[in-house]
Amino acid sequence: IKPTWEKLPEDTTEDTLVVELDPGTAFGTGMHHTTRLCITQMKKYLQKGQKLFDVGCGSGILSIIGLMLGAGEAMATDVDPNAVAAAIENAKVNHIDMSKYDVKAGDIITDADFRHTCGDEKYDLVLANILADVIIPLSGVIKDNMKPGALFVSSGIINTKEDAVREALLSNGFEILEVTHSGDWVAFTARK
């Protein structure tokens, strides 16, 4: 992951997956622990051709990497229109096929109509790298967008909120497959 204004390191090989990124005012440079936790889980679980949903997409880094890793299509949403603009621009910089990438501004937690326009029971993998205080209510509604057996990877969770997120996932019927840590941060991988 490199800023658009920097050159590639000389030791970069042809096999290296390079993502160019200009987050603008949106979160997501790829350097934060939570972003790396999500990328690691996505690389582990995403299968070629699967449908990906990036909730709270910020710069679009997770959905862009997902498409570069072989996702068949991706939806990205954020409540901030500036984040949506940044995600679209970053997708273009990385030569993402925009017919496979849809980015929308809206709140899937409070706006059921918006949530349903994003796709009912459509996604194989949902990523949410946002705050625990958002993941907790999100866990109560995101299943509407997930296929049976789909995975939900959530991070942006400070370790002091780990138990609250675990309880929300379990009480909303998720099966927790993995809990990963980096620094003071936590990621959950859960199955619908």
Model-found features: residue ranges?
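Non-catalytic substrate-recognition/targeting regions of SAM-dependent transferases
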Residues: 1-28
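Short, glycine- and charge-enriched coil/turn segments that flank and shape catalytic ligand pockets
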Residues: 8-16, 46-48, 117-119
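Short, flexible, glycine/charge-rich loop motifs used to bind or transfer phosphoryl groups or to couple energy/partner
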Residues: 9-10, 42-43, 65, 92, ...
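Short acidic, gly/pro-rich beta-turn/loop elements at beta-sheet edges
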Residues: 11, 29-31, 113, 164
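Conserved SAM/SAH cofactor-binding pocket of Class I
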Residues: 25, 29-108
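S-adenosylmethionine
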Residues: 79-192
